[in-house]
Amino acid sequence: MGHDHDHNHDAPAAPVDWREHGVKVIRGDQLDTNTPQTPGMNRAAAINAARVGAQKIWAGTVTIHPNAKTGAHHHGALESVIYVVRGHARMRWGEHLEFTAEAGPGDFIFVPPYVPHQEINASTDDPLECVLVRSDNEAVVVNLNIDAVEAPETVYWVDPIHRHPHDH
């Protein structure tokens, strides 16, 4: 049964110093490049345990130079979300990187735990810039040595509430 009074049963005994324990703004020119790297890309951390005390997420940026690609890798038990800010990403994934899909500015990419994958800058002229968020407070990167297929299958994922754009 609910209460008819207003108070928090879990309130801390001492007042919280919200200046110290509240919102933190991390400036774009103050990102930390001392984070696990994968050949072909540059990662920089904005949010992690060491910098801001994050308990359950890691966030940062990734830049892939024109016509470059990363080595194959996965992120252990972590889920990853990539948001494409600028440029065009070509993702490959699978045991032999046998699947591919592309994403552009404004698109989100979800990478489940333990999925071997590779990010490719689909442009020969412009950098690919993305925001990256992972489901733990530290970056986990396991670089892999994979024999990739020569011609991966293009996959267009359709969620349960949206139609495939070619089904109109």
Where are these regions (language model features)?
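A short, N-terminal "cap"/entry segment at the start of jelly-roll beta-barrel domains
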Residues: 1-56, 71, 141-168
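Short, charged/polar surface micro-motifs in flexible loops or helix N-caps
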Residues: 51-55, 65-69, 86-90, 139
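Short strand-connecting beta-turns/loops that link adjacent beta-strands
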Residues: 51-52, 77, 96, 124-125
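Short glycine/proline-enriched turns and hinge-like loops at secondary-structure junctions
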Residues: 55-57, 75, 103, 122-124
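A short hydrophobic beta-strand segment most commonly corresponding to one strand
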Residues: 59-62, 81, 110, 125-143
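Conserved metal-binding segment of the jelly-roll/cupin
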Residues: 65-67, 93, 103-123, 133-135
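A short beta-strand-loop-beta hairpin characteristic of the jelly-roll/cupin
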Residues: 69, 78-105, 115
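Short conserved catalytic/interaction loops centered on acidic-Pro-aromatic/His motifs
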Residues: 98-99, 120-128
